[in-house]
Amino acid sequence: MAQQVLGCTSRPIRVSLHRCSVITTSDTIRRKNLRFVRNPRLSFSLQSSTRNYRLPSINCSTVNGAVAETAEYYEGEGDNVSLAEKIRQCIDFLRTILPGGSWWSFSDEVDGRFIAKPVTVWRALSRMWELVAEDRWVIFAAFSTLIVAALSEITIPHFLTASIFSAQSGDIAVFHRNVKLLVTLCVTSGICSGIRGCFFGIANMILVKRMRETLYSTLLFQDISFFDSQTVGDLTSRLGSDCQQVSRVIGNDLNMIFRNVLQGTGALIYLLILSWPLGLCTLVICCILAAVMFVYGMYQKKTAKLIQEITASANEVAQETYSLMRTVRVYGTEKQEFKRYNHWLQRLADISLRQSAAYGIWNWSFNTLYHATQIIAVLVGGLSILAGQITAEQLTKFLLYSEWLIYATWWVGDNLSSLMQSVGASEKVFQMMDLKPSDQFISKGTRLQRLTGHIEFVDVSFSYPSRDEVAVVQNVNISVHPGEVVAIVGLSGSGKSTLVNLLLQLYEPTSGQILLDGVPLKELDVKWLRQRIGYVGQEPKLFRTDISSNIKYGCDRNISQEDIISAAKQAYAHDFITALPNGYNTIVDDDLLSGGQKQRIAIARAILRDPRILILDEATSALDAESEHNVKGVLRSIGNDSATKRSVIVIAHRLSTIQAADRIVAMDSGRVVEMGSHKELLSKDGLYARLTKRQNDAVL
């Protein structure tokens, strides 16, 4: 019953086949008795075995989105399998590995979170041309030298053969002329090939740079909800390996394809002039080779997409593990994390195995057809020489040019398969590049002449796009007057930080609206608004740069070092900063600063902005008691500054932090349940009073 529920309907049977074990599962990671499978399909087990095993039962469970099968193997029971059954299993296996068999299928290897639409080769090339169009002279120079080099190279066999036979005939004048032309062609080809390689390398650099610039810029201006559905490892994989894979199109693939198409066309014309019957035979063989090449190229395109997805998933696991290394080390889960990473590596190896097998078939096809061309040329050409229809010199030229044509076809096919891989990798990159920026960055909002800081939440409700069935905030009505300090408290998950995210316009309310000085928030210029808001989060993030740059981060006005030091002193960060080896020039590192020190730098950053609206989301949670007391005094002075009249919103679990607030809003399950001063809420004996009592009891 468990197998039917989890979709594990097939029972893998392992048989001995020339010391190569075969298992009837496709996506299999063999770690002792643990295997991850998506669907029943044949794949190789890389472990050799001389014994037969039979799998009587399988217990299924879900591990990281895959199905884990814990199998029990028993020795000796393989002898009960009849010879006819073994032969039938071997025949079934051989049938699956034939072209078109199930072993070659990738139908459900990857469940992508962001499904990309297929991109045609022409569409991909036109997109790449758009990226390099500003430097089209580099492309033109590259292709111009390519044409000269290709034409020079294709004429070399003619003069090489003519030189040999003119020397044999004793015609010295013709021999000297042919040698001079041969030297000229070789020198011209060498010079143009070098210039061609240089210009194509420059074009490759331009393409990958522009592609990464465009993709990075596009991602920067997406809604926050987009990043909620994507992982950092996946996005960095698009910027890194995927863009690099696509950039090979101009510098390598198109370069070699055009070069060999020119040379192959020249060789074919020359062959038809020499002997049209032999030329047609060679052309037929090249057409067969081209058909095989097309099928192989399409297969390579599909494998490239899967390798792209699996590589991104592997990068995601590695990045997550490295970023949480302290947690991994404390809980001793190194082996589990290795198994998670190895899961994706095994899937990558499984696809690469089939990719290598496909390449082997393509290579076998080429060599077979290549040697067939030689046999036909020698057979038919020899008979033609005996009949007096052609000369030995003509046959020699024919053999050289037929070989050139076949190899040109092979190189076109090889690079075309690489081109198809690059096009497959480009699908997700181009689809991300086509994403429209957030409406906040497109529309030009209103900029108020004077901002007083009057904030109103009017019947605001909100659900996160990733789980829109759950209402995080419901019908919230809160008003914050200029110069007022309003604290928001409640249990975890009650919607406190969500209100801050809505005020910062990281998300739009599902219903209701937020007013700032009577103007709907969505009508205001986002950049202008955020420049007037100071925000300190409960887990402040600092950039890997010096402390001074972190403090002045986001300020659009000229900031002096004295301003930075003044803000740091107000945040009680100056003393520990000056104690660091390089003071304010110290590069921030996670191991260098404690959580409290990071929070004080974040508070200094907010103070330096001189904001009209100050938002503190658990801004003192990582501070010690003395630092918290000092910072609270600074924050009170900031909020009560008569010259600026800042509006301050404080979110805190430490209720001692917000007792002096003008008003306290208590929230529960996304709703406002109480509102008033500290004394008023204590007298109501409601949620706030219960929270206060619990914290006091915890202290005692």
From Swiss-Prot:
ATP binds at residues 490-497. Residues 455-694 form the ABC transporter domain. It is found in: Plastid, Chloroplast membrane. Residues 139-421 form the ABC transmembrane type-1 domain. The chain crosses the membrane at residues 137-157, 182-202, 268-288. One of its GO terms (molecular function) is ATP hydrolysis activity. GO terms for cellular component: chloroplast; chloroplast envelope; chloroplast membrane; mitochondrion. Gene3D superfamilies: ABC transporter type 1, transmembrane domain, P-loop containing nucleotide triphosphate hydrolases. The keyword Transit peptide applies. It is a multi-pass membrane protein. InterPro entries: AAA+_ATPase (IPR003593), ABC1_TM_dom (IPR011527), ABC1_TM_sf (IPR036640), ABC_transporter-like_ATP-bd (IPR003439), ABC_transporter-like_CS (IPR017871), P-loop_NTPase (IPR027417), Type_1_exporter (IPR039421). Residues 1-59 form a transit peptide. Keywords: ATP-binding, Chloroplast, Membrane, Nucleotide-binding, Plastid, Transit peptide, Transmembrane, Transmembrane helix, Transport. PANTHER family: ABC TRANSPORTER B FAMILY, ATP-DEPENDENT PERMEASE MDL1, MITOCHONDRIAL. Belongs to the ABC transporter superfamily. ABCB family. Multidrug resistance exporter (TC 3.A.1.201) subfamily. This is ABC transporter B family member 26, chloroplastic.
